Design a protein with these regions (language model features):
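Extreme N-terminal, non-catalytic leader segments
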Residues: 1-22
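P-loop (Walker A) phosphate-binding loop of NTP-binding proteins
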Residues: 26-28
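ATP-binding Walker
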Residues: 31
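Walker A/P-loop
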Residues: 34
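Post-Walker A helix-loop "phosphate-sensing" segment adjacent to the P-loop in P-loop NTPases
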Residues: 42-52
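ATP-dependent small-molecule kinase phosphotransfer cores
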Residues: 53-112, 116-118
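Conserved phosphate-donor/acceptor-positioning beta-strand/loop module used by diverse small-molecule
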Residues: 111-117, 127-150
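Small-molecule kinase domains that catalyze NTP-dependent phosphoryl transfer to phosphate-bearing small molecules
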Residues: 149-200
Length: 200
């Protein structure tokens, strides 16, 4: 839309409605990503500006795990084919996705926060340039201790996860958040990132 200033020949380009911000949380297993996100979600519960969408996963919910929408592999494939997902990926033998409704939230200028795989970062940036990547991590010794305490993997699997943890995403808008102390400290740092202007 172009607006001519009264009494002058000047033409002012009206600024488009600002787009929202996509905040993608990544990091190694044992870093505490879900705990940090949940802490921020609770702190921002009264703020409609911030959206924390539930992920869609091809597994049943179990006590202690994140709340998510469950789909069978067949239903997941059908939804993917009709473009129902904003992002989707496969990890550890499961399919994951973020709902397509995220696009509407971003179009209305809201901040969307989600835990994703590093594999979809570039696709997310292409879809929505105003993307911030928050790498939640901890020192290797802390990660190893947390992974062993979970008891889900054997020693070889733990070593493999620690090796992958060394690789961090690059590109614009990447923030590293160290979660090696009290959870509330990491949550407060994360809230500061969410409330800060996006760096694109």
């Amino acid at each position: 839309m172009r607006i001519a200033a009264a009494g002058t020949d000047a033409v002012v380009e009206a600024s488009a409605k600002p787009k929202g911000r996509l905040v993608l949380v990544v990091g190694p297993s044992g870093a505490g990503k879900d705990s940090v996100i949940e802490g921020a979600r609770r702190a921002l519960a009264g703020h409609a500006q911030f959206v924390f969408p539930r992920r869609i996963i091809t597994r049943q919910s179990d006590p202690g795990s994140e709340e998510h929408f469950t789909l069978s592999e067949a239903d997941f494939a059908r939804q993917r084919e009709v473009g129902a997902f904003f992002l989707h990926w496969r990890a550890h033998g499961l399919h994951y996705a973020l709902p397509g409704a995220i696009a509407d939230a971003l179009a209305h200028g809201r901040t969307v926060v989600a835990n994703v795989s590093r594999a979809v970062i570039e696709e997310a940036r292409r879809k929505h340039p105003a993307t911030t990547v928050v790498v939640v991590t901890a020192p290797p010794a802390v990660l190893a201790e947390r992974l062993k305490a979970r008891g889900r993997e054997d020693a070889a699997a733990v070593e493999g996860r620690l090796a992958r943890a060394a690789a961090e995403p690059d590109g614009p808008g990447v923030v590293t958040l160290m979660n090696d102390g009290p959870l509330e400290v990491a949550v407060e740092r994360f809230l500061q990132v969410l409330k800060a202007p996006a760096q694109v």
